[in-house]
Amino acid sequence: MAVQQRKKKEGRKSDKNAPSVPQVDASLDKPLDIDAPPTIYSVNLKPEYGTAALNLSADFIRQEQALANKYLFFHPVILVVLTIGLLIYLTPRIVFPIRNTGSVAGWFYQLARINKKVVLSGLVFTAIGASFLFTLLSRVSDSYFKSKINQLVGSKGEKVFGINLNDLVARHETKDPVVNNTHIIVYRETPIALISLAPNMTLSTDENLVMSVTTVGCRRVYVKSGIIEDLIDWAMLHSKNIRSSGKYGETMKLLIDVYSFDSTLKEILKKKGFTYIQSIRVSENRLLGGLFGVKKELWGLQFHFKAEHKD
């Protein structure tokens, strides 16, 4: 038996020398092929989808960065800074009306008329300041999310998918069951969405299986199509199947991390029965987690199963 196992391992090593599997087009900057049949289907993490899976996961992080930029720009701290800056600019330059107009509306009309050029220049000054702040904030968020992408790429996807994607692509087939924990949606022969799960070894026990969503998302244009809801449904069903195939107790949990500014995903989770558990401030970036209060929230869904009695 030991000899057979050794031969299997040697066989796996030899697979790495085999030519890589041709990859499905993974470009995210190209429109879908209109000549391809308009069919939609799902697959697990097959070797030919390795590059596409990595690209999609990185794109999900960039989408989170875009949401973070929007959150930062309209944050109360930034709005207060811009308002104070505008007041500091206008206060010494504004000329107040001398004549009594007899009405509040008339007084404000004269105020605006007299200070028309000053107000316009103040708005230009504010726009320049806002542009500077937006550039600065974009760099702050870029450094944080770029580090997340670097971690994903540096681990060859193993951090998210539980398998080295380079090794997966180098094989023409894989029997590793971990590939079944990833669900990819393909439309017009192009991967457009995916979700991946992994057992949470820290929280799982013999009595309680805990599964964690490691990545979930879709191409930006399909966010409002309901495809995220379908991915969450698959995650719930797949988690139940894993629990059924193992020797676990009567409870199971499905967990997912969500950024505090991602209101769209949180609304979807609420509809699916998930509840907020806890949150922690982003510690890798002091500005994001400290000044702007960006948090990573943990949401979860708990399942209860009836005990199976065997005669």
Curated annotation (Swiss-Prot):
Protein keywords: Membrane, Phosphate transport, Transmembrane, Transmembrane helix, Transport
Segments traversing the membrane: 71-91, 118-138
Single Gene Ontology MF annotation: unfolded protein binding
Extracellular side: 92-117
Superkingdom as given in the UniProt entry: Eukaryota
Pfam families: Pho86
Membrane topology annotation: Multi-pass membrane protein
GO biological-process terms attached to the record: endoplasmic reticulum to Golgi vesicle-mediated transport; phosphate ion transport; protein folding; regulation of phosphate transport
Spans within the Cytoplasmic topological domain: 1-70, 139-311
Any single Gene Ontology cellular-component annotation: endoplasmic reticulum
Skewed-composition ranges (Basic residues): 1-11
Role noted for this protein: Involved in the uptake of inorganic phosphate.
Protein name per the record: Inorganic phosphate transporter PHO86
Record organism: Saccharomyces cerevisiae (strain ATCC 204508 / S288c) (Baker's yeast)
